[in-house]
A protein has these predicted regions:
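Residue-level detector of beta-strand structural context in well-folded domains
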Residues: 23-25, 102-104, 124
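Short, compositionally biased "basic patch" segments
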Residues: 1-26
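Metallo-beta-lactamase
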Residues: 9, 15-17, 32-36, 43, ...
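Short, solvent-exposed secondary-structure boundary motifs
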Residues: 12-20, 92, 103-105, 115-116
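Active-site HxH/HxHxD metal-binding segment of metal-dependent hydrolases
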Residues: 41-109, 200-207
Length: 213
């Protein structure tokens, strides 16, 4: 695992298909135990996670992150799974959702749960109070930085809902994260966003949805 902040660790890379990479992220700053965002592809990092204190909670951003690893993570660490309830049909084929997410709120781990449907019906982002006063925004596939350096949204014609996704992006534009971390990407894994530039990044992604829709 690679440490990218004093309280944030990145799992080794996985390549589901050419041009796409994924990671999971272990946040060690939560008051109720370590939090794993997204999901690993293998158990290769389990021992390092255990050495860092294990996984008390796991958060999925949407159904595409569900797979056999969910049950393995829960079995190894006894973790509590937080995930959007509207995607129970897909996630539930692998394991049980322990904390069903439905609306925007700050939970007992200090994480702000922000429903951002559009990429999928249950897509959800998470705003985390990171170390040194910085905030980390975990965006799943809702918005990410492409290999061309252009911010894009996870819009797939026929599968995603353009209008709903646009509304979700407008919502995210009001945030001011210091670090933006998507679950699948073609460029950098975690992107530092200087100052108030985030709203411009979101507008860039929204423009891309308009072109495709």
């Amino acid at each position: 695992m690679r440490q990218i902040r004093s309280d944030l660790w990145e799992t080794r890379v996985d390549n589901p298909f050419p041009g796409l990479t994924t990671h999971a992220y272990l946040w060690t700053g939560a008051v109720n135990g370590n939090v794993l965002f997204y999901s690993t592809a293998t158990d290769a990092d389990f021992d390092e996670m255990a050495a860092l204190g294990g996984v008390a909670h796991q958060y999925l951003s949407h159904r595409d992150e569900a797979g056999p690893q969910l049950a393995l993570i829960k079995s190894r660490f006894g973790s509590v799974l937080h995930a959007p309830v509207v995607e129970q049909a897909d996630i539930g084929t692998h394991t049980t959702i322990d904390i069903e997410l439905t609306d925007r709120h700050v939970d007992d781990n200090g994480i702000e749960v922000i429903p951002t449907p559009g990429h999928t019906p249950g897509s959800t982002c998470y705003l985390v109070p990171g170390a040194n006063g910085q905030s980390y925004l975990f965006t799943g596939d809702t918005i990410f930085l492409g290999a061309d350096g252009v911010w894009a949204a996870g819009y797939f014609p026929g599968l995603s809902d353009a209008k709903t996704l646009q509304n979700s992006l407008r919502l995210l534009a009001h945030e001011q994260p210091d670090l933006v971390i998507s679950s699948a990407f073609a460029a950098d894994s975690a992107v530092q966003v200087p100052g108030r530039r985030w709203s411009a990044c979101v507008e860039q992604a929204r423009a891309g949805v308009t072109l495709l829709a």
